[in-house]
Amino acid sequence: YNFLRRHEKMDKFVLNLIHRPEMVPEYSATVTGQGKEEDIGDKALLTESLDIFKTQQRLAHENGLKVTIQMTYASLFNDEAVEIAKHDHEVYGDEIALSLLGLPCEEFREKYKTKDFCIWMFSMEDKKAIVNDVFEKFHDKFGFYPESTGSYYMDADLTNYTKEKYPPVKCAVAT
């Protein structure tokens, strides 16, 4: 039986290709550490980040692949990133998801009065407020709640809260 199962043809291969429009990439913090002044609103950085996202999307679609677009908090404030996601959702059937990464943007810093940006570093009370803020901003932009979300790390309390508060979420990706 095992021999037969190992040699059967696989009918379906599932690939979940995830792109995040990173308006303020976390790697940009390393540039600051090399003596450059921090500017999370740097237009050149925003343009470069958006160009990378557009290229990823174009290449995926040219090769017939659908994509899960994980919108970051920062990208929800970028009209072009939102329009690309809406377009690719309608035209190619890409999923529009929500990442709890990409928090370090001017809007986040002003609202939460911190430069911290890792969701797992906040108190549970603050995590809930951030999740509510991010999910409601997503809903305002797209008219629905995402079916998937993710972060580098999501503890059980945060995962359970997200699922309870936002039942459309069926998947959480934590790397």
Which stretches of residues belong to each language-model region?
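Catalytic alpha-helical scaffold of carbohydrate-active enzymes acting on polysaccharides/glycoconjugates
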Residues: 1-148, 153-175
